[in-house]
Amino acid sequence: MNKKRVISIVTAAILAATLAGCGSSNSSQPAASTEAATEAAAETEAATEEAAPSDGPVANADKPVAWFNRQPSNSTTGELDMTALNFNKDTYYVGFNANQGAELQGQMIADYIEAHIDEIDRNGDGVIGYVLAIGDIGHNDSIARTRGVRKALGTGVEKDGEIDPSPIGTNTDGSATSVQDGKLTIGGKEYTVRELASQEMKNSAGATWDAATAGNAISTWAASFGDQIDVIASNNDGMGMSMFNGWSKAEKVPTFGYDANSDAVAAIAEGYGGTISQHADVQAYLTLRVVRNCLDGVDIDTGIGTADAAGNVLTDDVYEYNADQRSYYALNVAVTADNYSDYLDSTVTYAPVSNQLDTATSPSKKVWLDIYNASDNFLSSTYQPLLQNYDDLLNLEVDYIGGDGQTESNITNRLGNPSEYDAFCINMVKTDNAASYTSLLSQ
């Protein structure tokens, strides 16, 4: 029955009961029969409103949105785009704690240098020289990782109250102004730590975090000052492995990355120095779980901090939630020679949240999801396979869209039919470009 029709009938019943109750009474209190009728009518109306189907399809602008991997933000200042994060009441971001992970990577490198000081200064000049592969100068995660390395090694220079994350080009003479020489005292001996070179790994087409560019960079650096390079630090494993396979593996120069990609973890047995797991298994789960909860109309914490009916739940040592930022962050773990065997398969779902949902309470829904760059090693070889493992468990039919890593239009041109989907999981090319997607959903 039409909701408006039901309410009209209920209203008529209230009026009839009220007239009957007022026939001979002069009391200022409503008659008992009137109270009963009013309460019954109110209960009927509430039940009808709850049970009645919505008047037509849900507007695209009101459907759940999960930003992931690239947090909507100003690529210059890092300021969060709260308009995008509050696009509607069912909008969230899923990523990882960038600062915690960045500091962990920097400390992992510093600890390795101290533990291997006898062999790490390859030319015996008392200078521990390192090169740094920067992913994207406008990406918050890349900025944090560059700062984390420079902070731990004492090479950072403050600018506007923060460590300057700028690439320096070549700095073999230590004259660059965006970094400084650090000092380490190990076994009573003082060593200088110098960032010999760093650059943003962007290819000619504009794609950042580019592994091939990193491979070319290490070849150029090695040809010019290879005997001075004692350590390689990379903002991610894709670039790190390109440099490792291209030069540092043969030269036995420890290389450190980020993401715990399967090939990088396996390479630790061959001399790769270490990497950071950003708990992609937890991130991928959260990406789909938040839209699942919104679609089901349950508390957003269901199956996250609070166990669901299937027993899925996360503990607070693997994630955190910032309500003001509407953001879920996975916590990071260092992967080294001591524990790498536990991380060899990065596509295995996280056991505590690997239980199948019941289709009776979580029916099949259709989700549009894009990967900003189909060639990105971490997203294509780790994150997407995890998403594909979780989508079945969460009863979600997901259409996966792979971008070219260069332009938003390469992705948004394939979002011409948003009405066909129940929710959207968005991975932008650039963190500034949230409006490219929300404008489509708002039409």
Residue positions per predicted region:
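Bacterial Sec-type N-terminal signal peptides, specifically the leucine/valine-rich hydrophobic h-region
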Residues: 16-19
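A residue-level marker of the well-folded mature domains of exported/periplasmic proteins
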Residues: 22, 26-443
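Bacterial Sec-dependent N-terminal signal peptides
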Residues: 1-10
